[in-house]
From Swiss-Prot:
Source lineage: Eukaryota, Metazoa, Chordata, Craniata, Vertebrata
Similarity section: Belongs to the orexin family.
Subcellular location: Rough endoplasmic reticulum; Cytoplasmic vesicle; Synapse
Keyword Nuclease: no
Protein name: Hypocretin neuropeptide precursor
Residue numbers of Methionine amide PTMs: M97
Propeptide: 98-131
One Pfam family of this chain: Orexin
PTM comment, free text: Specific enzymatic cleavages at paired basic residues yield the different active peptides.
Length: 131
């Protein structure tokens, strides 16, 4: 027979530890007087947790959603970063990224196999396409 505490999830244990350890650290008299670390001022390290604890706002919501957030620069730079880090054909994705930025896909004039037949019949005798 398993004891009742054997099925406690990792998230529950983490939350309990945060609730037990953070209030004394945050409410201590020296906590508010601590200066911002050099690495946070220079933006050379990840200081998201430090900013959550010492900044204004709902700290509990920020801490609970910290692991769920996916940071990434918006726009083309973020998409380029995701393309480079993902598996697959990087060259094809990067080469077509500019075209996909604001352009809508071109409408297909004819559905299915008829498009292939129309394209094949429009090729000029010199090998150039008449389309």
């Amino acid at each position: 027979m398993n004891p009742p505490f054997a099925k406690v999830s990792w998230a529950t244990v983490t939350l309990l530890l945060l609730l037990l350890l953070l209030p004394p650290a945050v409410l201590s008299p020296g906590a508010a007087a601590q200066p911002l670390p050099d690495c946070c001022r220079q933006k050379t390290c990840s200081c998201r947790l430090y900013e959550l604890l010492h900044g204004a706002g709902n700290h509990a919501a920020g801490i609970l959603t910290l692991g769920k957030r996916r940071p990434g620069p918006p726009g083309l730079q973020g998409r380029l970063q995701r393309l480079l880090q993902a598996s697959g054909n990087h060259a094809a994705g990067i080469l077509t990224m500019g075209r996909r930025a604001g352009a809508e896909p071109a409408p297909r004039l004819c559905p299915g196999r008829r498009c292939l037949a129309a394209a094949a019949s429009s090729v000029a005798p010199g090998g150039r396409s008449g389309i």
